[in-house]
From Swiss-Prot:
Gene name of this polypeptide: nrdR
GO MF annotation list: ATP binding; DNA binding; zinc ion binding
Name the UniProt record assigns to this protein: Transcriptional repressor NrdR
PROSITE patterns (UniProt xref): ATP_CONE
Origin organism lineage: Bacteria, Pseudomonadati, Pseudomonadota, Gammaproteobacteria, Lysobacterales
Alphabetic keyword roster: ATP-binding, DNA-binding, Metal-binding, Nucleotide-binding, Repressor, Transcription, Transcription regulation, Zinc, Zinc-finger
Protein family (similarity comment): Belongs to the NrdR family.
Function (record text): Negatively regulates transcription of bacterial ribonucleotide reductase nrd genes and operons by binding to NrdR-boxes.
ZnF unnamed: positions: 3-34
Gene Ontology terms describing biological process: negative regulation of DNA-templated transcription
Matching Pfam families: ATP-cone, Zn_ribbon_NrdR
Cofactor(s) of this protein: Zn(2+)
ATP-cone domain mapped to chain residues: 49-139
Cofactor: how and how many bound: Binds 1 zinc ion.
């Protein structure tokens, strides 16, 4: 690293300390030529792919938007914060491991749907209704029936269509 005082190219590290959260390292350096001391901060750079939107626009991946998608789909659902965080980490990990510089928003949506399907079927259908632009009740019914056909026997989650139909008949249960 070049010295910021004399621009000499040889500096040595005289002390290193890891931050409390473990995400940065503070290094105290000394210039071999002029003897001046200075500090540097070293952080991890994790490059995530750029998201290509359906209209062709490109934007940097934003983990907050991803978290918001999960929060909206799972609003008022019995899913623990830790489970949601793990699902977000899983999607981010899949994107990072893809090794691609760009990824389509449709692929990100598919990753989200896989995670939601594991967490909560109602949240999954909520997300799918927006992601796949459901037009009417038949689209919901088709997705729910498809989901129920693919469920393993003895699944812990309630059968969606039965719950939806039962609630539809009771006022105030929306």
């Amino acid at each position: 690293m070049h010295c910021p005082f004399c621009q000499h190219s040889d500096t040595r590290v005289i002390d290193s300390r890891v931050s409390e959260d473990g995400t940065t390292i503070r290094r105290r350096r000394e210039c071999e030529a002029c003897g001046e001391r200075f500090s540097t901060l070293e952080t991890i750079e994790l490059k995530l792919p750029t998201v290509v939107k359906s209209d062709g626009g490109r934007e940097a991946f934003d983990a907050r938007k991803l978290r918001t998608s999960f929060d909206r789909a799972l609003q008022k659902r019995p899913v623990a914060e830790e489970q949601i965080e793990a699902a977000v980490r899983s999607v981010v990990h899949q994107l990072r491991m893809s090794g691609e510089r760009e990824v389509g928003s449709l692929r990100v949506g598919e990753y989200v749907m896989v995670e939601l399907r594991k967490l909560d079927h109602v949240g999954y259908v909520r997300f799918a209704s927006v992601y796949r632009s459901f037009q009417d009740v038949a689209d919901f019914r088709e997705e729910i029936e498809k989901l129920e056909r693919e469920l393993p026997v003895g699944s812990e989650q309630l059968p969606l269509l039965e719950v939806a139909l039962e609630r539809a008949g009771k006022p105030g249960k929306r």
